[in-house]
Design a protein with these regions (language model features):
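N-terminal secretory signal peptides that target proteins for export/translocation
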Residues: 1-9
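A post-motif C-terminal structural segment
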Residues: 38-41, 46-142, 192-533
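Glycine-rich anion/phosphate-binding loops
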Residues: 158-166
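Bacterial N-terminal signal peptides
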Residues: 15-26
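Glycine-rich phosphate/pyrophosphate-binding loops
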Residues: 166, 171-172, 177-197, 525
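Short, conserved helix/loop micro-motifs enriched in His/Cys and acidic residues
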Residues: 138-158, 361
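Alpha-helix C-terminal capping segments
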Residues: 145-147, 173-178, 226
Length: 534
């Protein structure tokens, strides 16, 4: 399989310029329109989940390409994920002006003619993958949470890192307007880029807490716990196995903040406990928090702050996924706990659920881990669907939307070797021994993987080797590929109407997901700037 390097198509780039004023007119609610029926948002994000990885997991779990829980949702689209860094790099090469929110050329961010108007999956079909530059999770999640493009590394903050550059998130605005409950759930630290972008603001995604490496500003954890105070927070970052001595140069939460959380008048804390079933604890904790009139905080995770990653087994005809430690809840259990809590709010709710370990697995080119992580996401989506289907409450498909997408793609996976993998099949996977040089920074969330992923020129050296060539990973970093969007329930049409407005085909921009949600929730069009407190 031949990999074609990125190139710029001048003719296409000149063809589509997006002017913000027009976009605002398009999405403005009509005068006199009745209040939207949408009250509940369940927003799933598979971090680093490309279309190729979805197909790979579906083949393993179901023996076909379209068996995942969301692949048959009525609303289907593709999403461009570029950020300001990607845009400006492409603009320089094309000798075009840098990004401006008031006027920009969408096709400078993602070149449809070179890379296609849909994700490419399969052997001969995968002839071009935009390996980089690519967005990072912080700027990608900011686009989803605020509707603003920004720089890599920014958490709901304007590009260029101006003072007072905070951007109001859709979760904050929805809570302010209606009293809705808001929550974030993740398998990675609760203040990592994707969940943090919906409930905090900082020009640096690495400012995990005040005092970290001498950081004097308001850290992400501090802002989440002490200022924004989401109704539900469930994620990793527990110091028990990650930073038990509270070394101020590492970890995700300071000692003072952790002790304050344990004694908090606002939150009921459910935390990882040796020998305890984390899933049972968080579900019971949700009920206890409701009874006590408190918010719910679930603090879990293992070494590195993440939930212990699951693994898929090579078991032809009988797929089998082994979960991580039971001391952490599964993503499905955490999702149910969050929904049980938020569903009691008569003002509605907005829940963001991230499967963050897909990204880690793809950074490591770990096919087995990737498949297992997507299997866990499938379980969580099914649990959420069952919650909405459950009779006897006010949450149903007439007032609830469930969407599944990715913040970006990672790993450049290519399917289509001599052998097509089927139900329960995994490729032979061996760790590489030697790494001749370090990889360049190409949008990777963490640069080198723990296994020492490396790039050589011109051949990429994956941290895992697939000697039978059933599959190929093209990078340890992020890519600028289109990712999938699947939507079901109330307000599906709001998302679908944006397809083809900025890009040909069924493509919409990640900021347009935010626009669709704003319109469906009755929040109105996004102005030039939506800074906090203004």
């Amino acid at each position: 399989m031949k990999r074609i390097r990125p190139k710029t198509n001048q003719a296409l780039l000149g063809g589509l310029t997006v002017v913000l004023l027009c976009a605002v007119i398009v999405v403005s609610p009509a005068c006199g329109r009745r209040a939207p029926a949408l009250k509940h948002v369940i927003f799933f994000i598979g971090d680093g989940m490309s279309a190729q990885t979805e197909v790979a997991a579906s083949r393993y779990l179901y023996g076909r390409d379209d068996g995942l829980a969301w692949q048959k949702f009525p609303g289907q689209a593709y999403v461009a994920t570029w950020d300001v860094n990607v845009y400006n790099g492409n603009a320089r090469r094309a000798r075009r002006p840098p990004y401006s929110r008031s006027s920009f050329t969408a096709l400078l961010g993602y070149d449809v003619r070179t890379y296609g108007s849909k994700p490419r999956v399969g052997g001969d079909d995968v002839v071009a993958i935009p390996f980089g530059p690519a967005t990072d999770s912080a700027s990608a999640a900011t686009a989803l949470a605020t509707g603003f493009k920004t720089d890599s590394g920014n958490i709901s903050w304007l590009p260029g890192d101006p003072p007072a550059g905070e951007l109001t998130t859709i979760t904050e605005e929805y809570r302010t307007k209606t009293g809705a409950g808001i929550g974030v759930v993740s398998t990675v630290p609760f203040n990592h880029a994707t969940p943090a972008a919906f409930v905090s603001h900082n020009p640096s995604r690495n400012a995990y807490y005040s005092g970290l490496k001498g950081y004097k500003g308001l850290g992400l954890a501090d802002e989440i716990i002490l200022r924004v105070k989401p109704d539900v927070v469930i994620g990793g970052g527990h110091p028990l196995l990650d930073n038990p001595d509270f070394n101020p140069r590492q970890g995700y939460i300071s000692k003072s903040l952790y002790l304050g959380l344990k004694a908090s008048p606002d939150y009921l804390l459910v935390e990882r406990t040796p020998g305890a079933d984390g899933g049972r604890a968080i579900v019971e904790g949700a009920a206890a928090a409701l009874r006590a009139g408190k918010k719910l905080f679930g603090l879990f995770g293992g070494k590195g702050g993440n939930f212990d990653i699951a693994q898929a087994e090579d078991s032809p005809g009988r797929p089998r996924v082994t979960s991580g430690s039971e001391e952490n809840p599964s993503l499905g259990e955490a999702t149910v706990a969050a929904l049980d809590y938020l569903g009691a709010n008569p003002g509605g709710f907005f829940l963001v659920v991230e499967q963050g370990d897909i990204d880690w697995a793809n950074h490591d080119n770990d096919y087995r881990g990737m498949v297992a992580c997507i299997a866990e996401l499938v379980g969580a989506v099914r649990a959420a669907t069952a919650f909405v289907d459950r009779p006897g409450d006010t949450v149903d498909w007439t007032n609830t939307v469930l969407l599944v997408t990715a913040d970006h793609a990672t790993g450049g996976l290519v399917l289509g070797g001599a052998k097509r993998l089927g139900l329960g099949d995994l490729p032979r996977q061996d760790p590489r021994v030697a790494y001749p040089e370090a990889p360049p920074a190409t949008g990777s969330d963490r640069g080198l993987s723990p296994n020492g992923a490396a790039l050589t020129t011109p051949v990429y050296a994956s941290p895992n080797v697939y000697p039978d060539e059933d599959i190929i990973f093209g990078t340890a970093g992020h890519t600028n590929e289109l990712v999938d969007l699947a939507v079901t329930g109330a307000a599906t049409r709001y998302f679908m109407k944006y397809r083809g407005t900025w890009y040909p085909g069924l493509v919409l921009d990640n900021t347009q997901i935010n626009s669709a949600l704003r319109e469906a929730l009755g929040l109105g069009a996004l102005g030039r700037r939506a800074a906090r407190g203004t």
